[in-house]
C-alpha cells in the first residue's frame, strides 16, 4: 500500500513537470526562437534573401487599367447627366526595381532609386489598346478649371493660349486611341510664338504635365512619362536597430517631409513604400504605406480572419474615410470643414496639379450622390474594394510583403462650367470618372509553400506540443492526486439482534450483542449494565409493610 502511494506521488510530480515544461517551451522558448529567426530573415541587410527580393521583386505585379468611355459628350456640353461605360481591363506586367543602393550602418538606412516598368500583355487583356475612347480633355479642362479656381486673374491669358494650342477648340472632351492616352502620348504643338501659347506650354512643362518630344512639340500621357524612368530617390530604415521601423520611409528626393498640404501632420511620410512591412504587427495596427503618386499615406485596418492557399491569414481593408468629420485630416481639405472632398474621396489637385479626385473604383464606399450623378456606375465590393491578406505572426517572414493584395484607385475630373466661356459655360458640376487602376499580386504555390513549410509547420508543431503537454500533464496530475489521496473504506456486515420476550433467558440476548465499531462480540454481562430482577407481588407487598 505504501509503495503504491509513493508511485502515484512520483507520477503526479512527473506530469506536473511535463505540463510546466510544455508551457515554458510553447509560450517562452519557441516564440523567442521564432522571433529571432524572423528578425534574421526580414532585415534589409546586404546579402540576405529579403534584401535581394526588396531590390528586385522576382515576379511582376499585376497592373490592370479600366477606361470610362463617355457615351454622351454632346449632351454633357449642354448640361446633361453624364453616361459612361467601364471598358477593360488592359493588363500590364509591372516590374519594380531598386538600384544605386547605399547602406548607412550608423543611421540604419538604405538609400535607393526606384524604377517602374510596365509591359503590355495583349494575351491577358480584354482590349487591344487600339480602341477609340472619349474622356474629359485632361489638358484643356485641367488648365481652365485650375486657373479659374486658384488664379482667376490669369483666365484671359490662359483662354487665349488654349485657343491657340488646341485649335480648333470644339469640345471639352477628347477622342483618343487608348494606348496614346496611356503610354504612347498625345502631341501638343507648342511651335507658336504667341506669348500666351508659349507661357501655357512653359507652365505645363514645369508642372510635369507634358514631356518634351522635340524642340516644338510635347507629349502628354497618363503613364508614358513614368515608364522605365526614375521614380524618385528613397531612404528607408533597414530594421536592424529597430525591427518595427523596417521599411519605413525616412525621406523622398532628399526631403524628410512633403510641402503639399496645409498642415504638418498631412505632410509626414507614414509607413513603407508598400512592398514591405515590419513583422509582429497585431490586429490593432494599421498597415501604413506612402505613395508619391497621390502625395499621402494611407492605412489599411484589420477586418477579420481569412484564408489564402489554405493558410490562415488576416484580412485588411482600406477606407478613405470622411475628411469633413475627421479633424485630424482637415489639412487635406481646401478650406475645412466647409470645403472638403465628399466622403470616400481625396482631393489630389495639390499633388497632381489638376482638378483630380481620387476614390475607389465606381465610387465604392463613397457618398451615394456621386454614383447617382453619373449613369453607368455599379459599385461592387469584390471588384472595387482595396484589400490585403497578411500573416500577422510575421507578415510573411520570408518576404516581408503581403501574400495577396489589390490596390485599386479611380481618377476622376472635378468638372464644372467655365465662366464667361461660350463653349464650356453650360458644363454640369459633377465628378466625372476617367479611369481606374488596379495594382496587385497573389503569391503562387512556389512562395506559399515556403511560407507553409518554413513557418506554419513550426507553428503547428508548437501547437501540438503545447496541447499534448497540457492534456497529458493535467490529466496525469489530477489522476495521480486522486489516487494518492483516496482511502479504502472497508465495511463489515452487521448481524441482526434478536429481541427477547420476558420469558426468554436474558443471557441469550446478551450473547447476541455485537460491537459494531470493533466487529467483536461483547461479554455477556457488563458491570453496571444488568437490569435488576423483577420482584414478585408477595415480595412487593411485604416490602411495603
Swiss-Prot record:
The cellular location(s) given in this protein's UniProt record come to: Cell membrane
- Hey, which stretches end up on the Cytoplasmic side? 1-10, 486-545
Task: Give the UniProt tissue specificity note.
Answer: Selectively expressed in antenna.
Instruction: Give GO terms: molecular function aspect only.
Output: scavenger receptor activity
- This chain belongs to the protein called Sensory neuron membrane protein 1
Role summary: Plays an olfactory role that is not restricted to pheromone sensitivity.
State the family it belongs to: Belongs to the CD36 family.
Q: Which gene encodes it?
A: snmp1
Q: Which residues lie on this side of the membrane: Extracellular?
A: 32-464
GO terms, biological process: sensory perception of smell
Its ancestry begins with: Eukaryota, Metazoa, Ecdysozoa, Arthropoda, Hexapoda
Q: Where are the transmembrane segments?
A: 11-31, 465-485
Q: Which UniProt keywords apply?
A: Cell membrane, Disulfide bond, Glycoprotein, Membrane, Olfaction, Receptor, Sensory transduction, Transmembrane, Transmembrane helix
